[in-house]
Curated annotation (Swiss-Prot):
It holds the Pfam family Ldl_recept_a. This is LDL receptor repeat-containing protein egg-1. Residues 1-49 are cytoplasmic. The gene is egg-1. Coiled coil: none annotated. Residues 124-162, 163-215, 217-254, 255-290, 293-330, 372-414, 418-456, 457-494 form the LDL-receptor class A domain. Residues 71-551 are extracellular.
Amino acid sequence: MSQQPGSDRRVNFAQEEPMTLGEKISHRMDQFKEMVSSGCCSCASRCPSVAIVLILALVILGILAAIPLTLMLTSSAQRMSTDSTDLSPYSIRHPKFWPKTDKIHFNDLDGIPMSSLFPPNVSTCSGFGFACTGAVHMIIPSSKRCDGIKDCQDGSDEENCKECQSVFSCRSHVEEDSKTKRKTKVLPTLICLTAEKLCNDVQDCPDGSDESVCKSTCSKDQFKCTGNNACLPTSAKCDGVNDCTDGSDEKNCNECQKGAHKCGKQCIKASHVCDGVAQCADRSDEKECDCKSCSGSDKALCEDGTCIKRTQVCDGKKDCTDGMDEENCPGSCSIEAFSTKTKQLTCSDEKRYTESEACSGVVEACEQSCPKCHPKLTFTCPAVGGSQKRCIRRSKVCDGINDCDDGADEKNCTPIKECGIENASQFTCDRKCLDASRRCDGVWDCEDKSDEQNCQQCSSGSIRCAADKKCLPAYTRCNGVAECSDGSDEQKCSCEECLGAHSNTYMCNESNRCLKRDEVCSPYSMCPNATYTDKAYCAALVLKNSGRFPY
């Protein structure tokens, strides 16, 4: 039988052996390799098929692993956001009337108990007021929220307002209805405006309503300002805010409105009541306050309801009843340690000093506050005309400068040329001629203090530095300044020697050392063997300098 032409080119599939599983996998990998090399990367043709497949598998596994990790991070961020409401750097409360003291949570200062930095009867009313969006550590009182005045640097206190405390408000924007194409007033928030923004030829409201309140005739529930013809609601009268340019809306007020406080016939606006600054002569606008009214990062509330500035806490001046704002402050010691007989004076700087310090001539603010000048340390300038007598330090006598109004401190002075002629024991210093009795008496008559050096002994009531052979005035003992080279005048100080005799001093917690309060931190505590409280006080000053803390 003869073959048909072309029959030799037919393939007999029945005779072909099937591929194994491994051959199929290898075949698929070769196909994938060919696709990659021809589609995106020609260099893949030189790589083994197995390597390419393994790389692809690792990429897929990485993507799958990233999905649960992303979900975990998102959940953690939400949880942290919820917990962040506890960021309260000023949570100082009286242990009897407020919750337990919280801790601050700022940077490496975490864990410092604020109770060690504030008196126990003074609160900062944590949780009250409005936290500025751009600076959460800056808190403003609720009375300044949505009042038409930007108190936060970012103006966030005037954003998203649902209700205004200002005299005028308008809708924040006007949206168009997409179906009717008509403008409909959609009011998610309000714009709060003070009276000075009305009728000033500047459109602040989207609908221009702030420029349309000036009318010839006002409605029954309005009154007209004579200065700019603005029609304002009657509730704007006697609210402590001059809404009319001539102030006529705040004259002859028998009663005050909108939370304003009455002083005589004057109304103090609500935002100035319980703000730590007395507007009334009797300070009644700062009494009977609570945390809602006395809130803010610069305020402090005394247990008796007095609102004070936070800078007034532990400043050496009693602002709360019975001086509770000065009790148990860092660097203080027990009040029982002071002698009840120690007299104190309030000088022209409104700070209190012991009479011995105030009348020794070293505090200029007290020169006219003393009933009697120290007979040894000072010179008494007589009262002349309407002036009061003054106590000046003795080194100012015969220095060529008239410190007394009548020049009494420069009278009866021996000229330098005649010094030692009639009295051989006289000596000179700083263009002065002094008697020998003025040497080594524990009083600095010379500005360079040379009259108290090279002393074998000192007068009674003074201090002798054995290492330096010099005499010091008694008031220099434990004043925070080491006059002796060995520091012996500042060692083993008692509470009364430190705080009982000096102002503006800091008593180290356990080392019986006194330091000047403005020098105790540099920036860390300079106290020997500084305690937790000493360190916390200096940490507080770090926060203060960054605008984030109490004092």
